[in-house]
Amino acid sequence: MKPVVALVGRPNVGKSTLFNRLTQTRDAIVADFAGLTRDRHYGNGRLGKHEFIVIDTGGFEPDAGSGIYKEMAKQTRQAVAEADVVIFVVDAREGLSAQDHDIANELRRLGKPCVLAANKAEGMHDGTKLVDFYELGFGDVHGVSAAHGQGMRDLVELALAPLNLPDPDDEADEDDVNKPIKLAVAGRPNVGKSTLINTWLGEERLVAFDLPGTTRDAISVPFERNGQRFELIDTAGLRRKGKVFEAIEKFSVVKTLQAIESASVVLLLLDATQGVTDQDAHIAGYILESGRAVVIAINKWDAVDSYQREQIQRQIETRLPFLKFASLHFISAIKRQGLGPVWQAIAQAHKSATRKMSTPVLTRLLLEAVQFQSPKRAGMFRPKLRYAHQGGMNPPVIIIHGNSLEHVTEAYKRFLEGRFRKEFDLVGTPLRIQFKSSQNPFADKDD
């Protein structure tokens, strides 16, 4: 198993920058505002042959007594509990603070191995500015610069050294079959994304707080159900323009879209009390454009009456007609109602998105469809469809070869899609059909 390293420290000491450096990503939002990271944020790090999991935490204030900061402190304690080792991050430029002492006392109480990293130490060659940090009682102080990549290798080697890690070459690679299904939970702010994942996980790992957009970043966590492994991704949701922290929220939009791109299946979560909004339609459109398998869940179904239920079902038909292939589920995340069928739909959507289709079967279905209903003539030419093969998965792509295929109508494409979907039981996934014509336009001229 990969060792787990938690990054802990007061707000704005550069934990997210260090996280990004260790994982070689931009997964954590970085900007000059205190308190940006409010949930535990997981990423994969690597040092030489050794891989490890890094947890980025919110700014730790052990004595926070109320509101979101209390929740952040709770998240940090849970991260330390999950970790094999803690990197305690302090700010070399600002120097030692009373808050650093409070965190040090809390870390000693929690009892995990700890390495002290003084971040923002670029240019401090003599180390005299780091002397005060020895008061914290964690031994050597390691000056690093996450922004410039200085001291990273030494820091990680020191953190991993006590763990006596086995040689990764001695461990067998995991079979592709056992790789987790990546599931993104996407939707507007405050539709219940974090509440749903928390219900599934049985712990409050994501901060589900009564503020629109509380989860600002895409958070990924492992999960298992009925023997199937999943990686659940809660996204920040898409914000209207003009909200607070606009620069951060714009970056979060990018992370939401990247989460959709990286997922195998997307659960599109709508709010029954608000109906289908323009933002919902935009998110749905992006999911379709990305080619991801999708399941639609209407949350807070218990909070609306029968008239509102009819209204939202009509709205889905009229505003999201391009997601007809997706199954629709009515749930209450907070009351745990209707969640079982959602899992079945997710599994079915993933199976459909990764379905393998043989060339002989595809070609047989194509020729049977043409025999049942020929494509319409376009001027002198009638499209001739000759054979088909699979061109990709997730989404499934079917490539049809023949002559004058540029004249195939949209209606006929929908007809073919319906035949293929029925034969292969493709539910919850887009199906892309591509046409490749012969170079000789006269080869298919009707006599």
Swiss-Prot record:
It comes from the Bacteria. This is GTPase Der. Residues 355-439 form the KH-like domain. GTP 2 binds at residues 187-194, 234-238, 299-302. It comes from Variovorax paradoxus (strain S110). Belongs to the TRAFAC class TrmE-Era-EngA-EngB-Septin-like GTPase superfamily. EngA (Der) GTPase family. NCBIfam families: GTPase_EngA, small_GTP. Keywords: GTP-binding, Nucleotide-binding, Repeat, Ribosome biogenesis. GTPase that plays an essential role in the late steps of ribosome biogenesis. One of its GO terms (biological process) is ribosome biogenesis. GTP 1 binds at residues 9-16, 56-60, 119-122.
